[in-house]
């Protein structure tokens, strides 16, 4: 049986977004995104893997911050890059 993901369990639910208006990098370059993801470690807002720039995943590779949360209205799921699991 697989152990529960400790990263999601210990993620900070109260992390505030650095750029609530959109993807931090895309806003600087004028690019568009499909969906947004919030890093629960530092508040970075990045675009999803369906977006051409995939800034949320690039942020994980650069920082090793393990957990993102959907930054879409009405969605509350989380993803752990380390354990590759979804959580609530």
Model-assigned labels for residue ranges:
Residues 31-40:
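Canonical RING-type zinc finger of E3 ubiquitin-protein ligases
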Residues 23-26, 39:
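Short cysteine-rich clusters marking metal-coordination/redox-active sites
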Residues 3-22, 29, 45-88:
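Cys/His-rich, Zn2+-coordinating zinc-finger modules
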